[in-house]
Amino acid sequence: NFDIHVISRTCRTYNVQGYYIIHPLEVQKQIIDKILSYWQEGYGKVYNPDRADALSRVLWQPDIASAVQTIAERTGKQPYVVTTDARIYPNTVSYSFMRKQLQEGDRPVLLLFGTGFGIEAETMAKFDYILEPVYGPCDYNHLCVRSAAAIILDRLAGEAWWEKN
């Protein structure tokens, strides 16, 4: 519930067009639908209309392939599939590379965040890119998904504060 609220607000702040929650179990979809219904149609919409706006971009998909297909149908273009990890892979790219792809490229991006045990290495090997880890000032880099999403979306779509005088 908190991940849905917090990440949807972060996505809305950075103008992400869709926040896909990918999970194969129908019971998870029912939970998501119940949460969304409360905030978009129930008392929650009256209580906090901004949250209803942020949650309007949340979509459930049973698997990654379905999310890719939905994005391709919506945009007419096959998205890059990009994920994050605390480790380096052969297809790891920098935030500046991916930011440039988003600004200048003509393909949408499906950015995946794993939770719990993350995404299986075999699955990750099939993705177009893996973003470099988020490094802090020490060797610990195991962020919760909410923090990682906020930091990474800011790096990819936020204000280029470092270019200002």
Residue locations for each model-derived region?
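Conserved acidic residues
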Residues: 17, 79, 108-109, 128
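RNA substrate-binding interface of SAM-dependent RNA methyltransferases
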Residues: 1-85, 150-153, 157, 161
